[in-house]
Regions:
Chain A
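Glycine-rich phosphate-binding loops of nucleotide-dependent enzymes
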Residues: 2-252
Length: 252, 318
């Protein structure tokens, strides 16, 4: 139990008659790269939205590092170490890449409130920002505005912003959607490295089964708000219920 | 190179302003003071509008609070202008904190309408509390006491003396706003304008930063109102009227929302245009409207924004 980072207890959410989460119970262990999969409308995005504070659940509890965060606002969850990236690149369009990364860095270093010091002259912040830009391969474009980036680069930046918040647990919503093979390799390599380091525990929502099965140590299958499969990729592949509702359609 | 140019321009501007203070007629002094006071109002306002992306229609309330603050302070407490100005700023900031607390829960049109509603409430309070504010007559005949700093006593009774106090606060405001724009706080505000969801997911409480921007801009409005009162020596409730709230909006739009110097350039154009047009016609609003239309349609990013882009393009060609 010591190794558990996030626990979900009896989590439910319904939009009118549409049940997107029904008595969900699971826990995520530190350092175990987990994927959440499921057919369209299975409740994957809603689950992430609830866990990160975007939507309140109807009932249930979310425990993060032993602390009940069910009612905590988004920004406090992020400061506690729970962050996410978005399906659609969600960046600061008119700000430079440096500034894009600097905002979460300032938040982490608790410098965001200072209003008389210069950001550009803060060596510590610059070093940290450059480190992250280098990690996602965008260091050379640090002065370019984010709106001028290609779609794939914007996705890389998006992941960079999420990493800059120094999360313990990071949800990536379709991290490789719309990327070219080079960018995809880079981002997957980053995820593997960081995960192996043990700094960040990743939870990935993906449609691409190659990514899911090559990367994950654990796969959770959602279907209509229920968990219908949970285990190693092999176990999930072998699960008859999963094959029936989901894998049978896409993976042969 | 680029930043050197900026310092040269600022130094030149300050030199010109000092020159005006020593050598100009009273009329030019008066116009220059009006421009500087409007600049302080608009620069502070633009922290909220251009930087944070929140359009407020209620900032005249804070301007008026600053003005009434000085007037009441010098009538009942102390005539020291610096004490009065501090009281004015503090009162405006405090009012901004209360009003902002409710307004920052919303954005865009809802935010704008809320600020408008609060602004009108402040206006009618000032109109109706006759015993304190003098009702529709306002407060008039406020004298400028001397600025006494220990041994030193500086008289500001004459406009040519008061001018340098205005210039001092104008320069101080420029410095402060510039520092805010370079600071982490300023960057966070820009982040909120660009993408408030992402800012929240960067671990920052967006509402609190919006409120902080609201209070800071309210404090600058209070400073402008305080100086405006000392300049005119009277204030009426119309200082809080919503039509007065439009001034910093127009000024920021004309000069350039996303620029530091936009509100200053906008203020110069605004005050001079008005002065110029009013000599020929009483319907200055009509002609001003036409000119404003031309500036907004013709200069994308305001006068400063479009000029900078032009200079960049030209320097690339050559």
């Amino acid at each position: 139990m010591n190794n558990s980072l996030l626990q979900v207890r009896d989590l439910s959410k319904a939009f009118g008659n549409v049940v997107t989460a029904k008595n969900l119970n699971f826990s995520l262990a530190r350092g175990v790269l987990t994927s959440i999969i499921g057919p369209n409308g299975a409740g994957k995005s809603t689950l992430i939205n609830i866990l990160t504070g975007f939507i309140p659940p109807d009932s249930g509890e979310i425990i993060f590092q032993g602390k009940d965060i069910t009612r905590e606002p988004i920004d406090r969850r992020v400061r506690l170490g729970l962050c996410r990236s978005f399906q659609v690149a969600n960046v600061f369009g008119h700000l430079s890449l440096f500034e894009n990364i600097a905002i979460p860095v300032l938040a982490v270093e608790r410098k965001a409130k200072s209003f008389l010091r210069s950001v550009a002259k803060d060596g510590e912040v610059r070093k940290e920002v450059d480190k992250i830009l280098d990690r996602v391969g965008l260091l050379s474009q640090s002065h370019v505005p984010a709106s001028a980036l290609s779609h794939g680069d914007r996705r890389l930046l998006e992941v960079g912003i999420a990493l800059a918040a120094r999360p313990r647990l990071l949800f990536l919503d379709e991290p490789t959607a719309g990327m070219n093979p080079v960018e995809r390799t880079r981002i997957l390599q980053n995820i593997r490295d960081l995960s192996a380091h043990g700094e960040v525990t990743f939870v990935i929502v993906e449609h691409d089964m190659d990514v899911v099965f090559s990367l994950s140590e654990r796969v959770i299958v959602l279907y209509r708000g229920h968990v219908i499969g949970d285990g190693t990729p092999e176990q999930v592949k072998g699960n008859p219920q999963v094959r029936e509702v989901y894998l049978g359609e896409e993976v042969t | 190179m680029k930043s050197n140019w900026k310092y040269i321009i600022v130094a030149l501007m300050l030199l010109v302003l000092i020159g005006i203070g020593y050598f100009s007629s009273r009329f030019v002094l008066y116009l220059a003071m009006k421009i500087m006071i409007l600049s302080i109002f608009a620069m502070g306002y633009n922290i909220l509008f251009g930087r944070t992306g929140l359009l407020s229609f209620g900032h005249a309330a804070f301007y008026a609070t600053g003005a009434y603050g000085v007037a009441l302070c010098s009538m009942h407490v102390h005539t020291h202008p610096l004490v009065g100005i501090m009281v004015g700023i503090a009162a405006a900031a405090f009012l901004a904190l209360i009003i902002g607390f409710f307004c920052v829960r919303h954005t865009e049109i809802y935010f704008a309408m809320l600020t408008l509603a609060f602004g009108m409430m402040v206006f009618s309070l000032m109109w109706n509390l006759r015993d304190i504010t003098g009702g529709d007559d306002g407060l008039s005949g406020i004298m400028r006491g001397s600025v006494s700093l220990g041994f030193l006593k500086i008289s500001i009774t004459k406009d040519s003396q008061f001018y340098f106090l205005v210039l001092f606060f104008f320069a101080l405001s420029m410095l402060l706003v510039h520092r805010i724009y370079q600071s982490p706080f300023g960057l966070v505000l820009a982040g909120i304008r660009e993408n408030h969801v992402r800012t929240e997911f960067a671990g920052l409480g967006v509402k609190r930063y919006r409120l902080a921007a609201f209070v800071v801009s309210g404090a600058f409005a209070g400073l402008a109102g305080a100086l405006g009162l000392l300049l005119e020596s009277n204030v009426t409730p119309f200082a809080a009227h919503w039509s007065h709230s439009a001034n910093p909006v127009l000024v920021s739009l004309m000069g350039g929302l996303q620029t530091f110097s936009g509100p200053i350039v906008g203020s110069i154009v605004f005050v001079l245009l008005r002065e110029f047009i009013e000599r020929f016609t009483h319907n200055w609003m009509l002609w001003f409207g036409v000119i404003l239309l031309a500036i907004i349609l013709g200069f994308r990013g305001g006068i400063v924004g479009s000029t900078t882009q032009l200079v960049k393009r030209l320097s690339k060609v050559s």
